[in-house]
């Protein structure tokens, strides 16, 4: 029987000093035999997805104590990718994932916590906490802050649904007046919560449902809706039960590594492909699998992408559909339900809240349950009132979207496309693979060939696009923006948004060893591995080289002979694998430390102490 970890600091004569310090935090004699649960919060006033979390940690803490545990809250950092976008701040986004994972490990191990509730929400926070949970392998429940409501605006007599990306595209479009841009800006992000489309934050929070580490509704219930409070309340009670199951009954099904098995990772990736999730999820799923010592690789993702269809299209792939619409259609449990009906899911994986994922789907999929409670839960609607307050409204849809032929969620028999929403491409330009969000690619450019326009930084590409130097048919290549070369693997939301604003969203391709925001759509291919800084072929591309992209056949090729590539490689080896132009970029010691050990994207950009 495993001993409670906390007894290292709460039991025995020699721990009198530690107990004295625990008492100074408010603990009493009766508390020293209880499980100590870490409430890992990520409140910050910098990030709309986290601005409402201040009191939610203590809400969970009260429920933990009511269930017989001792709750101790601490915070991690949280970077807002949208605010950090387009300047040196984006260099810090991906490295912050590792810092978050490390900080959770440091706090939990230093204080011998028995279990934890992770209160996350935005882009790198959920992945960082997920990595920590699998690294520590103690009972864990995830509960996120929830998505924000979609923006709504009336322009020239027409109502539009909006999100962050619409504001960015409008600002770069010379045809839109300053007044209209202001109106869009003020309406795009109306409430607290993670940005309203199927961007990285919401994608990752949805994947925790498929992994079995969060409660149903975690990925889709709006941050503002009163129904979301139940998830926090239940998480507090559930984590005490999980801790007791493991430490008092030796039930390993309460542990993250048992729950998030290879089969569970396959479920999560199948969901990601079916819902057209952010390409960043691939990076984070690979990193989480690495922490959990799960043999899950790009090859597994490639295999899944060839058999899982696209069952849902949400912004940015479909601009008028947002997370509130996914929730109305039954949320993640209903997408999983359609995958289950198609034989594309591992039903027997355990979860934190049900014996198996199959049991959970049978209860929570709105097309197969008779529960009025479940159906009412998925009728939770946006309130339409700007606010930064959690659980502040109780609006309900009049009905649910159960149309699996033409609705927001489709059946396997009526998919948006037979090919899934994500694909792995390989070829001489990306020997170890790269990722494209096919759900956001227009059918007319699934096969694309064009001359390379080569840029050694995101900044250079942005200047060229805004100066109308990129033309229809071009393939924009942005290199030395990978985990090591950036460093930090910046998101390329501005280049893709500006291509859209110039009317080139369906006429150009963009290839990079960097990554893309979850808000990106178009023929945007990222995570090219190996990256340029690690000697990848992308570092050998020259201006005007022809590049061939074939998504249906999963290939990406540089139309240059092997002999010529060998000559270029020998020349580059002599020069060194770094940008030829001087980049005005403040790479601090902290960023250099990350770059020193960062691997390419095909390994999740995790640190490898043998990388140097």
UniProtKB/Swiss-Prot annotation:
Q: What is its EC number?
A: 4.2.1.9
| Record-listed [2Fe-2S] cluster binding positions | 122, 195
Q: Name one GO biological process term.
A: L-valine biosynthetic process
Catalysed reaction, written as an equation: (2R)-2,3-dihydroxy-3-methylbutanoate = 3-methyl-2-oxobutanoate + H2O; (2R,3R)-2,3-dihydroxy-3-methylpentanoate = (S)-3-methyl-2-oxopentanoate + H2O
- Per the entry, which co-factors are needed? [2Fe-2S] cluster; Mg(2+)
UniProt keyword annotations, A-Z: 2Fe-2S, Amino-acid biosynthesis, Branched-chain amino acid biosynthesis, Iron, Iron-sulfur, Lyase, Magnesium, Metal-binding
Q: Which GO terms describe its molecular function?
A: 2 iron, 2 sulfur cluster binding; dihydroxy-acid dehydratase activity; magnesium ion binding
One Pfam family assigned to this protein is ILV_EDD_C
Q: Which residues form the signal peptide?
A: none
Active site per database record: 517
Tell me a GO cellular component. cytosol
Write down which residues bear the modification named N6-carboxylysine. Answer: 124
Pathway the protein acts in = Amino-acid biosynthesis; L-isoleucine biosynthesis; L-isoleucine from 2-oxobutanoate: step 3/4; Amino-acid biosynthesis; L-valine biosynthesis; L-valine from pyruvate: step 3/4
Supply the Gene3D superfamilies for this chain: IlvD/EDD C-terminal domain-like (3.50.30.80)
Q: Which PROSITE patterns match?
A: ILVD_EDD_1, ILVD_EDD_2
State where Mg(2+) binds. 81, 123-124, 491
What does the entry comment about cofactor binding?
A: Binds 1 [2Fe-2S] cluster per subunit. This cluster acts as a Lewis acid cofactor.
Give the record's family classification: Belongs to the IlvD/Edd family.
- The protein's role, per its UniProt record: Functions in the biosynthesis of branched-chain amino acids. Catalyzes the dehydration of (2R,3R)-2,3-dihydroxy-3-methylpentanoate (2,3-dihydroxy-3-methylvalerate) into 2-oxo-3-methylpentanoate (2-oxo-3-methylvalerate) and of (2R)-2,3-dihydroxy-3-methylbutanoate (2,3-dihydroxyisovalerate) into 2-oxo-3-methylbutanoate (2-oxoisovalerate), the penultimate precursor to L-isoleucine and L-valine, respectively.
The subunit field of the Swiss-Prot or TrEMBL record says: Homodimer.
* Cited HAMAP family: IlvD
Q: What is this protein called?
A: Dihydroxy-acid dehydratase
Q: What taxonomic classification does the UniProt entry list for its organism?
A: Bacteria, Pseudomonadati, Pseudomonadota, Alphaproteobacteria, Hyphomicrobiales
